[in-house]
Amino acid sequence: MQHYETVEAVTFAYGQHHHLEIQITREIAKEQGIRHHILDMSLLGQITAQPDFATIHISYIPDKLCVESKSLKLYLFSYRNHGDFHENCINTIGKDLVNLLDPRYLEVWGKFTPRGGISIDPYYNYGKQGTKYEGLAEQRLFQHDLYPEKIDNR
């Protein structure tokens, strides 16, 4: 370190559960006489274990199978204690329903309460390959949110 004019340490606070990491880094920097900066990176989407609230819209055109509403509610309630990103949750719900129902067409749209003032409303859709519903899925995806609705409940 004596070959350099100044040496500084940077720690990224990204929401890690072990705050001890930051404390130890701070102490080592102090012992070495190094200036230490802690950059708060929590805005990068850490999973905070705080509840998220959403309205989930599910629309589908069945083929041979339908989902029973109570079963669907129980499945969706299982996400209450599930820590994941909004996009992953909606994609998983969509894929699970496609695997279960083998529908002609399905779409899932999650409208989540904003985090940090930014609204993330992920959308998933599926159209059975080789049918007109495959084209419908593509068309709906291109038109999805083309004219966003006015949101006044957030």
UniProtKB/Swiss-Prot annotation:
Pathway: tRNA modification; tRNA-queuosine biosynthesis
One matching Pfam family: QueC
Any one Gene Ontology molecular-function term assigned to this protein's record: preQ1 synthase activity
GO process terms (BP): queuosine biosynthetic process; tRNA modification
Keyword Disulfide bond: no
Sites where the protein binds substrate: 67-69, 86-87
Catalytic activity: 7-aminomethyl-7-carbaguanine + 2 NADP(+) = 7-cyano-7-deazaguanine + 2 NADPH + 3 H(+)
EC number of the protein: 1.7.1.13
Leading EC class: oxidoreductase
UniProt KW NADP keyword: yes
One cellular-component annotation, GO: cytosol
InterPro entries linked: GTP-CH-I_C/QueF (IPR043133), NADPH_dep_7-cyano-7-deazaG_red (IPR050084), QueC (IPR018317), QueF (IPR029500), QueF_type1 (IPR016856)
Keyword annotations of the record: Cytoplasm, NADP, Oxidoreductase, Queuosine biosynthesis
Subcellular location(s) of the protein: Cytoplasm
SUPFAM superfamilies per record: Adenine nucleotide alpha hydrolases-like (SSF52402), Tetrahydrobiopterin biosynthesis enzymes-like (SSF55620)
Signal peptide per UniProt: none
Active site (UniProt): 52
Family affiliation: Belongs to the GTP cyclohydrolase I family. QueF type 1 subfamily.
Role summary: Catalyzes the NADPH-dependent reduction of 7-cyano-7-deazaguanine (preQ0) to 7-aminomethyl-7-deazaguanine (preQ1).
Family annotation (HAMAP family): QueF_type1
Protein name: Putative NADPH-dependent 7-cyano-7-deazaguanine reductase
Organism of provenance: Streptococcus pneumoniae (strain ATCC BAA-255 / R6)
Higher taxonomy: Bacteria, Bacillati, Bacillota, Bacilli, Lactobacillales
Gene: queF
